[in-house]
Amino acid sequence: MHIHKIQAREILDSRGNPTIEADVTLTTGIIGRASVPSGASTGSREACELRDNDPKRYAGKGVQKAVKHVNNEINQALQGLSVEDQENLDRILCQLDNTENKSHLGANAILATSLACARARALSLNQPLYMTLNQGDMMTMPVPMMNILNGGAHADNNVDIQEFMIMPIGAPDFPVALQMGTEIFHVLKSVLKKQGLNTAVGDEGGFAPNIQSNRQALDLLSEAIEKAGFRLGEDIVFALDVAASELFNEGFYHMYSENQKFDSHQLIEYYANLISSYPIVSIEDGLDEKDWSGWKQLTTHLGNKVQLVGDDLFVTNPKILREGIAQGIANAILIKVNQIGTLSETRQAIKLAYDNGYRCVMSHRSGETEDTFIADLAVASGCGQIKTGSLCRTDRTAKYNQLLRINELASLPYAGKNILKR
């Protein structure tokens, strides 16, 4: 299981922007392949996504520099090494880059290589990827957080909150959960049409109409859930990704569609009112990534009622997560492999969260590819929750379809209402 060659190429992501794909060829001829996603709403402390900045190609968004790093330095450094030791490979990649944020080689170049090595190992063992990724955690089929109404940086509309998600916690298994979400998605389309609202979809496949308020979005979802024949609060609950860093300006949070602005305390009260009105069980990035005093207040006031997920706050970085744990900030972390740049560091963040009673939510990015690695990692890590968009666009459904295949192969329990236990 030794590496013969590593080769990368420039491909397109779901937004039509270049990204990187890497092939790791073993001496046996087996090829492991992985491609890297890209975010629109990004944390300031994410690992560096290396772009060419050449205005003559792809408006500066090309990734040929990252491709060359894989084909040259990375290929030379890893040739002859075994894919059996993922931590060693990732350590060498980080040492080769030798920067805090992977800005020399690019986190996109490093991650494509890291994930492709893991996939090559699974293929060489003739085992499913989720099996070879598992490190002894109790594996479960995750509850999907289905982003069926889009706003913020993920849509060209006037909605402030970035993601309105449904979670089918009442389903008996993953296939039924997917069915429930899909049926609600299609009913929602008819509800929007009936009210004369736009049914075009955003980056993650959710509908992106112009609506009057965040409450109206939740009311539309509630209507669709009931018309689809499901019980709100029992079969289906809500999750929000506020992406509050995108709303934060000069010390205030601006809800432009509602013509309101809030300080941290007022926004926490706003969330408390929403939680009392709707079955919201999770709020992601409820405050700005730098507003740690506000996050402390948020966690104190609402942390015993809902899951408070740090995305831009923690950027899948074990060092930053450790600081948050020490200060009692949030109670869950979003896991995005490209925020940190290697599989091993992603696993470290997951383990650190588990060891300190924090939950983990596996996540895609708004600029995705057909790669389904995160579906296997969600199952392997036993995180119990996954964000991978709405119920349309192949870049989103590819992950759901991979979870269906895993469910067919393995007799694993569906996380369901267990995610609500505290």
Curated annotation (Swiss-Prot):
Q: InterPro entries given for it?
A: Enolase, Enolase-like_C_sf, Enolase-like_N, Enolase_C, Enolase_CS, Enolase_N
One GO cellular component term of this record is: extracellular region
Enzyme Commission no: 4.2.1.11
Pathway of action: Carbohydrate degradation; glycolysis; pyruvate from D-glyceraldehyde 3-phosphate: step 4/5
Tagged with keyword Calcium: no
Say yes or no: keyword Nucleotide-binding present. Answer: no
In this chain, Mg(2+) 2 is annotated as bound at S41, D241, E284, D311
What's its job?
Answer: Catalyzes the reversible conversion of 2-phosphoglycerate (2-PG) into phosphoenolpyruvate (PEP). It is essential for the degradation of carbohydrates via glycolysis.
Its name, as the record gives it, is Enolase
Provide the species name. Answer: Legionella pneumophila subsp. pneumophila (strain Philadelphia 1 / ATCC 33152 / DSM 7513)
